């Protein structure tokens, strides 16, 4: 129809595994077409995610990399190594971003170690280095998410900002397209570059994606097609494509504006404050723990539970009956398997390891918390 459509897809390992278990070969084959057919490469970008739909801030730190690697392994097993090599962006479940310095550092380092080049983040989950919310303009440009741990080590990754909150209708009605139509170029790195409106839908909620999205997607692309030529008209574009075009224009992604997870400015402000000779002997990890404890004691609103697109809901409070067994299972898994894997990495291919890993990853699925009580928690 003369359109040049774009879409980014994020399927958890839970979902891919479930489709396989259900014997829905026709769905898997449709996804294989989107992942593997060269005609689809310019139009469809797959984003990586955790294998299970786990909330990063309250997932045990040693399991973050396991979640990332398990998804990559499963995706490659289904669609091949070439398809996996094209997966450069990461979509964290629930747009949940850790703000505890050590958790965020481990998360970003794991993403980088696993080959990811950029991350999609919720605008309210990040702040500028001096603790301010991102300006409207900054949410429409790429940023550099800096993660610093309690020992002062840093790692960073390019971040594209998802605006607004959790509302499937934002994608179901193609809100990003209509917002983008009214925008002008913005200054970045000595250039005037096109802003990017990035949005994500929370799967099938309330029939929106099934009943509203298909026609809205077509209508939006017809509007873009009919919007006139020239070099400045609005187009659909995927995340990696956008960043690669910026790099080709001479923009160095390592010089993007630096941002950090919310509440971290308050931590670093106290960490860097002058201290007595006695307190300066305290190591960084202990000092970080002290600072966080002091902030939590003085301000009940200060939280290290991370931020997501549902900031009115906590992923931690009231879920001890799920979180504590999950953490115990994780600790037992690593206590048992880590020495074995260190001595013989082929252990990860054994049925015992893979069954234990499967149950560990499944136990960390956020939906079991979000939906409260019942058979799972019992």
Spans of features found by a protein language model:
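Active-site and substrate-binding clefts of carbohydrate-active enzymes
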Residues: 1, 14, 136-167, 175-179, ...
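Catalytic alpha-helical scaffold of carbohydrate-active enzymes acting on polysaccharides/glycoconjugates
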Residues: 1-89, 95-168, 175-194, 211-231
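Active-site metal-binding loops of divalent metal-dependent hydrolases
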Residues: 94-95, 203
């Amino acid at each position: 129809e003369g359109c040049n459509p774009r879409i980014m897809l994020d399927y958890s390992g839970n979902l891919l595994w479930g489709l396989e278990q259900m014997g829905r070969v026709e769905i898997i084959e449709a996804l294989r077409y989107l992942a593997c057919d060269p005609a689809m490469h310019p139009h469809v970008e797959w984003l990586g995610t955790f294998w299970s739909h786990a909330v990063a801030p309250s997932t045990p730190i040693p399991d973050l990399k396991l979640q990332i690697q398990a998804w990559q392994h499963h995706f490659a097993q289904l669609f091949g190594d070439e398809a996996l090599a094209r997966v450069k962006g990461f979509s964290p479940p629930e747009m949940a971003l850790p703000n505890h310095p050590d958790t965020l550092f481990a998360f970003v380092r794991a993403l980088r170690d696993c080959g990811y080049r950029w991350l999609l983040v919720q605008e309210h989950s990040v702040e500028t280095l001096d603790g301010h919310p991102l300006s409207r303009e900054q949410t429409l440009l790429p940023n550099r998410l800096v993660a610093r741990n309690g020992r002062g080590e840093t790692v960073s990754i390019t971040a594209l900002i998802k605006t607004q909150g959790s509302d499937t209708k934002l994608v179901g009605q193609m809100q990003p397209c209509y917002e983008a139509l009214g925008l002008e170029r913005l200054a970045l790195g000595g250039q005037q570059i096109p802003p990017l409106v990035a949005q994500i839908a929370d799967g099938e909620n309330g029939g929106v994606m099934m009943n509203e999205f298909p026609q809205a997607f077509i209508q939006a692309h017809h509007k873009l097609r009919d919007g006139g030529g020239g070099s400045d008209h609005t187009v659909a574009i995927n995340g990696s494509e956008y960043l690669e075009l910026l790099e080709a224009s001479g923009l160095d992604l390592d010089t993007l504006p630096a941002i950090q997870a919310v509440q971290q400015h308050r931590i670093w402000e106290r960490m860097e404050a002058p201290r007595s000779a006695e307190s300066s002997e305290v190591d960084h990890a202990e000092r970080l723990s002290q600072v966080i404890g002091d902030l939590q004691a003085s301000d009940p609103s200060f939280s290290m539970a991370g931020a997501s697109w549902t900031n009115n809901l906590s992923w931690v409070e009231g879920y001890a009956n799920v979180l504590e067994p999950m953490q115990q299972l994780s600790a037992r898994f690593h206590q048992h398997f880590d020495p074995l894997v260190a001595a013989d990495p082929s252990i990860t291919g054994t049925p015992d390891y893979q069954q234990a890993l499967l149950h560990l990853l499944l136990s960390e699925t956020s939906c079991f918390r979000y939906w409260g009580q019942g058979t799972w928690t019992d």
